[in-house]
């Protein structure tokens, strides 16, 4: 298992190749704005989440702070390679990648 911090371009490549994208923000944050295809699994309940058999999982939050602070706990949720999107959805938007607004 890998635990690696990546930028938005690397995250986009992984997601395009089939990685599971998990938004760890609370449901109201995800509803207001999200990355298309991202699954919402808030940190408050991530421990019980079924992440399936994905070979790679990319976690993100708004700015990267929550995922960075919880990286070890997040990596314990799956046997897959774990990636943390540095800068979160803010970095994704700054890279020009699409977001969906509620």
Q: What do the predicted segments below correspond to?
A:
Residues 1-20, 24-58, 65-102:
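Rhodanese-like catalytic fold shared by cysteine-dependent sulfurtransferases
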